[in-house]
Amino acid sequence: MNKRVLVKFSGEALAGAEGYGIDTKILDYIAEEIKSLVENGIEVAIVIGGGNIIRGVTAAADGVIKRTSADYMGMLGTVINGVAMQEALEYKGLSARLQTAIKMEQIAEPFIVRKAMRHFEKGRVVIFGAGTGNPYFTTDTGATLRATEIGASMLIKATKVNGVYDKDPMKYPDAQKLETLSYDRALEDQIKVMDDTAIALAKDNKLPIAVTNMNEKGNLLRIVKGDYSKCSIVK
């Protein structure tokens, strides 16, 4: 069994049918899935994107907002999601802490890896917000970095599909699921598991990545217990 994992959710996942903002029903569902991991003795870290609030690349597209500023706006979006997730976890009776890569002490702790490790020892879920704290880096890269820093045995990317495909399954009915694939193939074939920086960082640190459908109840627990039938593994 994987003892410590980091789960990465997209910001869009929180938006639900509206496509923006936060759907509390989805938030509650995710918190319940995380609770099942904690109840099975798993130490859990979470990273959430900010696409339901604002996407840096999109905000900077027409040049009115500089890319660096747009990326910082995106980081703030991830903190909004982190605060919401912390509340949802506590609503379920779990203890949670939000740590951010940009200091904002009134609402979150600054990211300190040793402090995060102490939280795990005390059974707390740790949410990492504000990405890496630097523009031009995605939240996927931030998740990979944090997973490496805390010594996670696996990074789980919770998405809308049950794994990695050779082409977009939403567009191509004949898309083939890849049960396992190497970091090198993901990079060379441009298979969009995560961005190239995140994949390269995972490769350098031998961090396996599981890609699964977050909407199938129990998938996260199956994966941490070693059942990879409902996911794809990049290693």
From Swiss-Prot:
Q: What is its EC number?
A: 2.7.4.22
Q: Name one GO biological process term.
A: UDP biosynthetic process
Say where the protein is mainly found.
cytoplasm
Q: Cite the entry's keywords alphabetically.
A: Allosteric enzyme, ATP-binding, Cytoplasm, Kinase, Nucleotide-binding, Pyrimidine biosynthesis, Transferase
State the organism named in the record. Answer: Aliarcobacter butzleri (strain RM4018)
Q: SUPFAM superfamilies per the record?
A: Carbamate kinase-like
For the keyword Amino-acid biosynthesis, the answer is no
Answer whether the UniProt record assigns the keyword Kinase to this protein.
yes
**Which compartment or compartments is the protein found in?**
Cytoplasm
Q: Where does ATP bind?
A: K8, F9, S10, G11, G51, R55, T159, Y165, D168
- The molecule here is called Uridylate kinase
Q: Where does UMP bind?
A: G50, D71, T132, G133, N134, P135, Y136, F137, T138, T139
Query: Could you name the Gene Ontology cellular component terms for this entry?
Result: cytosol
State what inhibits or activates this protein.
Allosterically activated by GTP. Inhibited by UTP.
Q: Which gene encodes it?
A: pyrH
> Catalyses which reaction?
UMP + ATP = UDP + ADP
